[in-house]
């Protein structure tokens, strides 16, 4: 089984220049659930009263999925989560030598003792505990297994494998997660960053290697270059055989809401949700699409509330012109159509813009 634990309201909001208000958070949380998220990570209680109040309002929505907070592995952060009434927590701890040196003076014994104390307290409160392995991709797997073994003994439920600085490749991800998952210590959750454009690919490689869950953010917002995209991971899980019922209305509203609230434009060619990703210009492709809608599309655009189109551009062929002429009631003459193509290519090249059907008619 594979699930999505979306962190748009936590790591997504850590995008520079992004700040969601309470109303936006509530709408995003509800739409994430409706669009198919299995769990939500919704904030950092230790930030203070306003954040805690927002988290309480999200909990008051009574969404039928787990709601999690992000915390440092400290008693103070845990107490802040408990005050909100949360039942699931991520307890973040550095696991790479470089961050352990910076945050714990290289003292792994002190780190493990602190982690143990906080996990014990969290389990005493009957919380779901995810151990967040900060900078896992620069850590030694043997140390990660030591942490996972300790966590399992203390009753922790999950280990979050964080590619904190976004340096993983899909191949390396698969190797590392396969090694960790084969130990059968804790369920593994992927947390990938997009610094080299591989966040979604790495999340999928993690699933393939045995990871149970992955963090995502809507349209891939997040620290620096962002995180694995919710919509991309959601649809990619179908490639792995997961049954997914797409709520296209909720997904479309979710994308629009997050784009507006974060002031992030949705590129027209953004995978899964860009409005032009089902636009076919190449003459060879259009000819194939006229014969079968499966020729050059990975899934039906209507599933996501999108539409296919056949713009009249530089690379258009006779099939495109015939399609558009017929759409306005003109029975095309193939010889005339073929003579039009060079002229259309010249016009489009000069003005850097496709022709409309009405312009073709003229």
What are these regions (language model features)?
Residues 168, 174-291:
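Catalytic alpha/beta core domains of metabolic enzymes, predominantly
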Residues 100, 163, 216-222, 235-244, ...:
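Short beta-alpha connecting loops at secondary-structure transitions
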Residues 46-63, 69, 74-79:
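N-terminal active-site wall of soluble small-molecule enzyme domains
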Residues 2, 244-362:
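A mid-to-C-terminal "edge-of-domain" accessory segment
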Residues 69, 135-143, 193-198:
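Active-site glycine- and acidic-residue-rich loops that bind
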């Amino acid at each position: 089984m594979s699930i999505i634990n979306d962190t748009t309201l936590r790591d997504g909001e850590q995008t520079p220049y992004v700040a969601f208000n309470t109303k936006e958070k509530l709408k995003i949380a509800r739409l994430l659930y409706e669009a198919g998220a299995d769990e939500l990570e919704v904030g950092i209680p230790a930030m203070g009263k306003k954040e805690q109040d927002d988290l309480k309002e999200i909990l008051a929505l009574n969404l039928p999925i787990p709601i999690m907070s992000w915390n440092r592995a400290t008693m103070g952060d845990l107490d802040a989560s408990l005050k909100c009434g949360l039942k699931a927590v991520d307890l973040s701890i550095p696991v790479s030598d470089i961050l352990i040196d910076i945050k714990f003076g290289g003292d792994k014994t002190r780190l493990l003792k602190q982690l143990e104390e906080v996990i014990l307290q969290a389990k005493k409160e009957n919380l779901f505990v995810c151990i967040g392995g900060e900078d896992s991709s620069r850590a030694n797997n043997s140390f990660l297994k030591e942490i996972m073994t300790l966590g399992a003994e203390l009753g922790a439920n999950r280990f979050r494998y964080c590619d904190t600085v976004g340096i993983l490749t899909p191949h390396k991800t698969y190797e590392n997660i396969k090694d960790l998952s084969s130990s059968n210590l804790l369920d593994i959750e992927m947390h990938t960053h997009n610094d080299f454009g591989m966040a979604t690919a790495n999340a999928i490689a993690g699933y393939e290697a045995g990871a149970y869950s992955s963090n995502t953010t809507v349209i891939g917002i997040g620290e620096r270059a962002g995180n694995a995209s919710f919509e991309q991971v959601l649809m990619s899980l179908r490639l792995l055989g997961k049954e997914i019922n797409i709520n296209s209305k909720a997904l479309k509203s979710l994308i629009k809401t997050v784009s507006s609230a974060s002031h992030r434009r949705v590129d027209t060619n953004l995978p899964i949700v860009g409005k032009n990703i089902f636009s076919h210009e190449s003459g060879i492709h259009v000819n194939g699409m006229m014969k079968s809608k499966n020729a050059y599309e990975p899934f039906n655009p209507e599933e996501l509330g999108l539409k296919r189109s056949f713009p009249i551009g530089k690379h258009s062929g006779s099939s495109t012109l015939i399609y558009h002429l017929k759409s306005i009631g003109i029975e095309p003459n193939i010889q005339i159509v073929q003579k039009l193509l060079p002229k259309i290519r010249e016009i489009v090249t000069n003005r850097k813009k496709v022709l409309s059907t009405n312009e073709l008619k003229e």
